[in-house]
Regions:
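Conserved, mostly hydrophobic/aromatic
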Residues: 6, 48, 76, 107, ...
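Mid-to-C-terminal alpha-helical segments outside catalytic/metal-binding sites
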Residues: 1-8, 12-55, 105, 228-235, ...
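Active-site gating/metal-coordination segments in enzymes
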Residues: 54-55, 63-154
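Active-site environment of divalent metal-dependent phosphoester hydrolases
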Residues: 10-13, 63-66, 95-99, 122-123, ...
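Active-site neighborhood of phospho(di)ester-bond hydrolases with catalytic His/Asp-centered motifs
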Residues: 2-5, 58-59, 90-91, 116, ...
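Short, surface-exposed alpha-helical segments at coil->helix boundaries
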Residues: 41, 70-74, 163-166, 193, ...
Length: 274
């Protein structure tokens, strides 16, 4: 079995009215322009079948507009009904909206398997953000993983890179060691610091996905991450439609069968409670 641990789908209404949604949501504005590829569930399923992928996590973004968050959550939940065997639904919320806790509980009641993808840029205030901390408490109560975008502190700039640097992500883990976190893009490099015993000890509930790996890192990062952290904590993820599925899968060809079984199957089955 191959599970893609991070993809994105959006309703067609957003594709047709891109500029309208860019005006109302700052994260959407950061990530999307006229050249950004947006797909609906049917296109994702088609590409999954072509590339032998059995299941995919479908996630939102770190919205700053509550109504947009609801729209995308509803679409992901509808897509789950249409493709119950293929879609692993996640929900996302505006971490500054007082209505987000209610929205999260609504999505949990409808069967989401996790929260995310969240994009956190206001690093100075987020650790003391009451709404965000309540979201973490709800996630902990329901044993739900939280996908958070990780940003590399050096390297090339790109749309939506953000400022969720390893130093901040580790502070988040320190304060919330019982929560299950999945840090995208190998946590912006946080995975490498698990070679330090004190970091590894505190990060026992932290996982790392490989979203957009061909855009960010050489393929050797899979083996490097396994050696730095654990074979049990690395998740294959494409970030489709940003990156072609075939290209992402090709990057893993050199891994051993047991390494592939962990990143494709064993690890996501465990963390997503499949």
């Amino acid at each position: 079995m191959i599970i893609d641990s991070l993809t994105h789908i959006l309703p067609e209404e957003i594709s047709k009215n891109l500029n309208q949604f860019k005006k109302i949501d700052s994260i959407f504005n950061d990530f999307f322009d006229k050249n950004t590829k947006i797909v609906q569930a049917e296109q994702l399923i088609n590409q999954m079948k072509k590339n032998g992928i059995n299941k995919s996590v479908t996630a939102g973004f770190g919205w700053t507009n509550h109504e947009l968050a609801i729209m995308v959550n509803d679409y992901i939940l509808l897509s789950k009904k249409q493709f119950p065997e293929e879609i692993i639904p996640f929900c996302s919320v505006d971490i500054n909206s007082k209505k987000s806790e209610e929205e999260l509980l609504r999505c949990i009641s409808k069967g989401v398997k996790g929260i995310g993808e969240l994009h956190i840029n206001n690093l100075e205030n987020i650790l003391d953000n009451k709404i965000f901390n309540n979201i973490l408490k709800i996630a902990l109560h329901y044993n739900l993983p939280i996908i958070i975008h990780g940003s590399e502190p050096i390297g090339h700039k790109y749309r939506g890179k953000g400022r969720s640097y390893p130093k901040f992500l580790f502070k988040l883990v320190e304060k919330n060691q019982d929560n299950i976190f999945i840090f995208s893009h190998f946590g912006g490099g946080l995975v490498f610091y698990e070679q330090m015993p004190e970091i590894k000890k505190i990060s026992s509930n932290v996982y790392y996905d490989s979203a957009a790996q061909p855009f960010l890192y050489d393929k050797s990062i899979y083996r490097t991450s396994i050696l730095s952290s654990s074979i049990n904590k690395i998740l294959f993820a494409s970030d489709f439609p940003l990156i072609d599925l075939k290209k992402c899968l090709k990057q893993t060809d050199y891994l051993t069968d047991i390494e592939k079984k962990h990143i494709f199957s064993y690890n996501p089955i465990s963390v997503f409670n499949l």
